[in-house]
Curated annotation (Swiss-Prot):
<feature type="binding site">
    <location>
        <position position="56"/>
    </location>
    <ligand>
        <name>substrate</name>
    </ligand>
</feature>
<feature type="binding site">
    <location>
        <position position="216"/>
    </location>
    <ligand>
        <name>ATP</name>
    </ligand>
</feature>
<feature type="binding site">
    <location>
        <position position="281"/>
    </location>
    <ligand>
        <name>ATP</name>
    </ligand>
</feature>
<keyword id="KW-0067">ATP-binding</keyword>
<feature type="binding site">
    <location>
        <position position="318"/>
    </location>
    <ligand>
        <name>ATP</name>
    </ligand>
</feature>
<comment type="similarity">
    <text>Belongs to the phosphoenolpyruvate carboxykinase (ATP) family.</text>
</comment>
<keyword id="KW-0456">Lyase</keyword>
<protein>
    <recommendedName>
        <fullName>Phosphoenolpyruvate carboxykinase (ATP)</fullName>
        <ecNumber>4.1.1.49</ecNumber>
    </recommendedName>
</protein>
<dbReference type="GO" id="GO:0046872">
    <property type="term" value="F:metal ion binding"/>
</dbReference>
<keyword id="KW-0464">Manganese</keyword>
<keyword id="KW-0312">Gluconeogenesis</keyword>
<feature type="binding site">
    <location>
        <position position="443"/>
    </location>
    <ligand>
        <name>ATP</name>
    </ligand>
</feature>
<feature type="binding site">
    <location>
        <position position="197"/>
    </location>
    <ligand>
        <name>ATP</name>
    </ligand>
</feature>
<feature type="binding site">
    <location>
        <position position="253"/>
    </location>
    <ligand>
        <name>Mn(2+)</name>
    </ligand>
</feature>
<feature type="binding site">
    <location>
        <position position="191"/>
    </location>
    <ligand>
        <name>substrate</name>
    </ligand>
</feature>
<dbReference type="GO" id="GO:0006094">
    <property type="term" value="P:gluconeogenesis"/>
</dbReference>
<dbReference type="Pfam" id="PF01293">
    <property type="entry name" value="PEPCK_ATP"/>
</dbReference>
Length: 527
């Protein structure tokens, strides 16, 4: 492992006897309980609350403006610059703050299951439960390789509150990435998901330099090597749909696509668990055992029983657990190139078909568009679904220009024989508020049919507005459900709503003037 020269203050903190290194999960649970950071549930999981911040705070995320990365960053509302001087000053304040604590936790983990692209990570935490979370989410065993990648260091101090007037932040919370110093600095927020997504942002910057497409997707495969990718924003079903009893899980959220195939960036899963039941998601249910972390799930203090139906603290309730907690997980999580790709969207308008086939040009169009709905709880201030477009189904985590990632996907689709499907896990029979959420059992049936090739010979009809190729039949799904206008009570209302969404697609796509005409024409039709 190539070691970067760290600051003397950071080295001093890491070498201090008050900093506890490489503690196992059992000891971290014990420390968390002793420090009143959480409680045990009846299944042995550690239940914690994250306070004010129950989701990511994207407005408080910054990238340090540095010469080595300046020209490669897509600066804007997502990637906001902060000066190196301001960052270093704040970093030193945080390190001095952690120095005063009675105990800190430090470990080495890794991002990237493929040895050729594995990034070493040192993570330093104020909270025992944050350290447990990171231990379960990052890869724990180093691959037998020496790829020369310099390690990144996460410094997490959730109880340190920044002063915007002094520290140059927007609020008390901050997530700052320095590619030159190889540091991720997090403070003011107890939401552990910030660590996971910051590392993903780092990998989204580093991997393209090695010819690898980083992807916000889940992935699974069969024993025969038929790999599938599931793209989609938070809450669209990536984790749920990739946890199939009939397929081997590669990972639930973050992957790389190299010339050799697919690899997981992480070593664990971070599943949404609002409404979780053993019947609907048995693998996730069983994974919530000792060593797992439950975020913001209401727990009965007398019985220790979690109430997965409750959104009292947030709709964004989460479970973090290691990949090996899934019985059929593929370990190490490396597989061949995909045979099928599924774009997941939770359509709040209720007008997109539950499943449709995409041409290569349509796949590029919908990848660039990244349409879905922001779902309650995944970000602060979101309480109802809201139509949104997130380029490459992961715009908040992309430091580079979207066109770079889209071009890479286009090249992959060109080189491999991959069938792409668009699957709507959102509403049917009406928009949000009047329609109903498509049943998970139906979505599972459609996905299984797509992956098993059962739709290959089924007749399709072209949707007159969206231009999508919709199968007329799918095993296990009512035929009328496949055509949205047939399940709306008011067809005129459907038509108006569909045209409204089509217009939003066109307005959003104006942000990609360099897109080929063949891709632009693959979108919805307004006339």
């Amino acid at each position: 492992m190539k070691m970067l020269h760290r600051s003397a203050l950071l080295e001093q903190l890491l070498s201090s006897p008050k900093t506890l290194h490489q503690l196992p999960a059992s000891t971290l649970v014990e420390h968390a309980l002793q420090r009143n950071e959480g409680i045990l549930t009846d299944s042995g999981a550690l239940a914690v609350k994250t306070g004010l911040y129950t989701g990511r705070s994207p407005q408080d995320k910054f990238i340090v403006d540095e010469p080595m990365s300046r020209d490669s960053i897509h600066w804007g509302a997502t990637n906001k610059p902060i000066s190196s001087e301001v960052f270093t000053r704040l970093k030193d304040k945080v390190l001095h703050y952690l120095q005063q604590k009675e105990v800190r936790y430090a470990s080495v983990g890794f991002a990237g299951a493929d040895p050729s692209f594995q990034l070493p990570i040192t993570y330093l935490n104020e909270f025992a439960w944050h350290h447990l979370f990171a231990r379960q989410l990052f890869i724990r065993e180093q691959a037998p390789s020496n790829n020369g990648l310099e390690p990144f260091t996460i410094i997490s101090a959730p109880t340190f509150k920044a002063d915007p007037s002094v520290d140059g932040t927007r609020s008390e919370a901050f997530v700052i990435i320095s590619f030159e110093q190889r540091i991720i600095l997090i403070g003011g927020t107890e939401y552990a998901g910030e660590m996971k997504k910051a590392i993903f942002s780092v990998m989204n910057y580093l991997l393209p330099e090695a010819g690898v497409l980083p992807m916000h997707c889940s992935a699974n495969t069969t024993d025969e090597g038929e790999t599938a990718l599931f793209f989609g924003l938070s809450g669209t079903g990536k984790t749920t749909l990739s946890a199939s009893e009939h397929r081997r899980l590669i990972g639930d959220d973050e992957h790389g696509w190299s010339e050799k195939g697919i690899f997981n960036i992480e070593g664990g899963c971070y599943a949404k668990c609002i409404g979780l039941s053993k019947e609907s998601e048995p693998q996730i249910w069983d994974a919530i055992a000792f060593g797992a972390v439950l975020e913001n799930v209401v727990v009965d203090p007398n019985t220790g029983k979690p109430d997965f139906k409750s959104g009292e603290l947030t709709e964004n309730t989460r479970a973090a657990y290691p990949l090996e907690a899934i019985p059929n997980a593929l370990l190490p999580s490396v597989a061949g190139p995909p045979k099928a790709i599924i774009f997941l969207t939770a359509d709040a308008f209720g007008v997109l078909p539950p499943i449709s086939k995409l041409t290569k040009e349509q796949a590029m169009y919908h990848f660039l568009s990244g349409y879905t709905s922001k779902l309650a709880g995944t970000e602060r201030g979101i309480t109802q679904p809201e139509a949104t477009f997130s380029t490459c189904f992961g715009a908040p985590f992309l430091p580079r220009k979207p066109e770079e990632y889209a071009t890479m996907l286009g090249d992959k689709l060109e080189n491999d024989d991959v069938q792409v499907f668009l699957v709507n896990t959102g509403w049917t029979g009406g928009s949000y508020g009047t329609g109903t959420r498509i049943k998970l059992a139906y979505t599972r049936a459609m996905v299984e049919a797509a992956l098993q090739g059962k739709l290959d010979e089924i007749e399709t009809v072209c949707d007159p507005i969206f231009g999508l190729y919709v199968p007329t039949h799918c095993p296990g799904v009512p035929d009328e459900l496949l055509t949205p206008r047939r399940v709306w009570k008011d067809e005129a209302a459907y038509e108006a709503t569909a045209l409204q969404l089509a217009k939003q697609f066109h307005e959003n796509f104006s942000a990609f003037p360099a897109a080929k005409d063949s891709v632009r024409l693959a979108g919805p039709r307004l006339a």
